[in-house]
Amino acid sequence: MMKDLISIITPTYNCGQFIEDTIKSVVKQTYQSWEMIIVDDCSSDNTKEIVEKYTSQDKRIKYHVLQENSGAAVARTKAMELSVGSYMAFLDSDDLWPENKLESQMNFMKENNYAFTCTDYEQIDEKNNSLNKIIKTKKKTNYNGVLLSCPIGNSTVMYNVEKLGKFAVPNIRKRNDDALWLQILKKEKYVYGMPNVLMQYRVRNNSISSNKVDLIRYHWYLYREIENLSVFRSVFHICFWIFLKLSRIK
């Protein structure tokens, strides 16, 4: 494990339209002690050609292709297994970071002795245009808080691997990131929020996140099968999630 090296975990699948901008946002970081591990879940577009162009230019960028299409959870877990950094950050292959992201968040963690952190983020469209919507995280959140209403943007997370170790991402198609945060919060009491916008989250028209019926099913599986909650608690959390979604409709 290399001290103060940040391992950037990036699963990808058919993201050739966006992944070049994602990689560029990493290369431009003011904090330069990083490795970017891109694990490809058997893309059928031009993802491979784009990524290999950058691996040939920068040895810090590493590319691994799964033997068969297995889902984002398996790709994330593989990237985590391959990582050697003492810190781990997560970046989806269509999201972007401002150039001060790693430096600012590393300083925030060290100055406050935090092991698990996230940040605010903004939404952009498929052409990188701002949607003028900022998603704010909470100052700190525990396991029950994440169960009730997860305030964590996946591509904002950074955690201390030396303190917390590595984790296997629960193998569910959606909400596997939430399941990972819940695992970490069984070991670390809080995730601490940094009140700065340090990520741009891309809203895509064909995103799996847009199918609300499927999301209810994934939530149910997360609560019942992964977290072993009772039927009552699972129904309560799903109803609360639906309430939050409805309350945000203008």
Features from the language model and the residues they span:
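Short loop->beta transition adjacent to catalytic acidic/histidine clusters or analogous donor-positioning motifs
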Residues: K3-I6, V27-I38, N46, D58-K62
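Acidic helix N-cap motif at the loop->helix transition within catalytic regions
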Residues: Q17-E20, D45-K53, L96, N100
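A conserved acidic beta->alpha catalytic loop
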Residues: S25, Q32, D40-E49, E68, ...
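Glycine-rich, basic loop-to-helix element that forms the pyrophosphate-binding segment
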Residues: L66-S83, S104
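Conserved nucleotide-sugar donor-binding catalytic segment
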Residues: E81, K138-D214, Y218, L222
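Short aromatic/hydrophobic "clamp" motif used to bind/position activated sugar donors
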Residues: M88
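Conserved donor NDP-sugar-binding/catalytic core segment of glycosyltransferases
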Residues: N100-L131
